Every structure is written in structure tokens, then in C-alpha cells.
Amino acid sequence: MPSIRVLFVLLAVILLFMEVKMTSAASIVKDVDEDETLENEDGEAMENSWPWHGVEDTSDYSDLSDLANSEKRGTCIDLGSRLYCKLIRRRGMCRSRSHRARIAMMRCERSCGRCHL
């Protein structure tokens, strides 16, 4: 019967690990606070109200060249598993915690402030 106990312990460890991953993802979403004041590259405060009007999921676009040539620029916002752009007139700042998302956000800053996944 010790094998059944080992299986239950293993199952408990797996469930605990899944719980930790879910809470860390939730903390990333909470990081974008409604009342938080963001600053652009010029140090000017940007409005950060939820829901953001003009938020676009650029992962649905097959050709991003017309987006990059647009006069509007966006701020990349990491909401867990995807990056979203908040469209603004001037180039904004990109934020993230995970290494992979930081790389995507650096590409965002280099490409007219658009999110490229």
C-alpha cells in the first residue's frame, strides 16, 4: 500500500505547484492597477483607466506593416499570457516582469510602440 500513499503525495505536490503558478499569474494581472499613474518617455503622466478604449490584440493581425506605419503609437501592457497595446498619440513605455515578455516588449518599443508577439 505505500505506492498509493506515494501517488497521493505526488498528486498533492502537483496540485500545489499548479496553485502557485496560478497565483503568480494573478499577481501580474494585479500589477496593472486602475489608479496607477504611468509616465511616458518625456516624464508626462498618462491616464491609466480600465477598460482602455482602443485596446487591440495585435496577435490577430497577419500583416503588421500598416500598424507600424500608423501615426498612433501604443503602450504594451502585459496581462498574463498576452501583450496588449494601449493606443496613445506619443510613444509610451513598455512594462513586464517575465524575461520572455520583456523581450517582446523591447521589440514593441523599437517598432513604433506596437506589440509584436
UniProtKB/Swiss-Prot annotation:
It is found in: Secreted. Shows more potent antibacterial activity at pH 6.2 (approximate coral mucus pH) than at pH 8.0 (approximate pH of seawater). Residues 26-73 form a propeptide. Keywords: Antibiotic, Antimicrobial, Cleavage on pair of basic residues, Disulfide bond, Secreted, Signal. Disulfide bonds join 76-115, 85-108, 94-112. Residues 1-25 form the signal peptide. The keyword Thylakoid does not apply. GO terms for cellular component: extracellular region. Coral peptide that probably acts as an antimicrobial peptide in the surface mucous layer of planula larvae and likely also in adults. Shows moderate to high activity against some Gram-negative and Gram-positive bacteria (tested on E.coli, B.megaterium, S.aureus, E.aesturaii, B.algicola, Acinetobacter spec.). Does not show antibacterial activity against the coral pathogen V.coralliilyticus. This is Antimicrobial peptide AmAMP1.
